[in-house]
């Protein structure tokens, strides 16, 4: 597949009163045209900061993108852009669906004008043509009676409807890349499923590449082609959805999968959780970031960052357990164990 986006050694820090927070520490991954890539991990792992860097939304100060970081979009290094180039890129080439539609939409403008504004900023069309396009977009995302809804304000819509409006705004200029940052936040389970299904249908219909940011592996099971697992500002594993769900190679990925609630739990059986807390990113650990919480940690994990080991079909993981000299008995997530994690 043809490459659309390449993130290479991305490092982002934020200056605070307590010190410099190293939010993203050497993140690298790719997105191909027409592909959906999910970026998953716990809160604070750097998922949203990575997406903001791709959109050019890191404010400096307090944010800082470190030298040596690169983000290539169609072979152009976005980090060399001037502000006018960013303005042309945002919305037209790459759009973003933000976490909370209620706070992301302008409460003083009706939803029609908010969509029209995005269209007229990037396309040479009249306001009447933009209004017709706005109605078409509302219909596309499944909002009934779009000609009437276009006059309504955000507070007059339900949470699910507001999120559909956010998707319509993001798709207004037919971008090549759509970033969905926790698009199901604050929505009930049935509406979550509808929004994820809508994004999947639109991706297939329009051929748009999608980056889906989430902490819930259950959300990405049926939509993502590839999954990038982040922890403590780093990518610890990435591969196809099938590899991540059935052949995970990193203890953190395995722990995330074990923590997904199952429908076949016995009565009063406790849910699985990951013990401990993520490390402080003001003073991140020198070795593996997951070492303090990992049940299989070794001495080398505490002192030396693990290399990235490559497996079949682009599957890779950063874990010392894959070193040729490491014993691998009873490790269900290590290749050769013959066991699979249930989806």
Regions found by a protein language model. Name each.
Residues 73, 77, 128-148, 258:
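Conserved ABC ATPase "signature" region
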Residues 3, 147, 240-343:
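Short catalytic/signature loops enriched in Gly
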Residues 152-157, 161:
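Conserved ABC ATPase signature
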Residues 172-176:
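A short, proline-enriched helix->beta-strand linker immediately N-terminal to the Walker B motif
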Residues 179, 183, 187-269:
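P-loop NTP-binding/switch modules centered on Walker-like glycine-rich loops
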Residues 1-4, 13-26, 57-64, 82-85, ...:
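A short, flexible loop at the N-terminus of ABC-type nucleotide-binding domains that lies
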Residues 77-95, 121, 243-248, 279-285:
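ABC ATPase NBD coupling module
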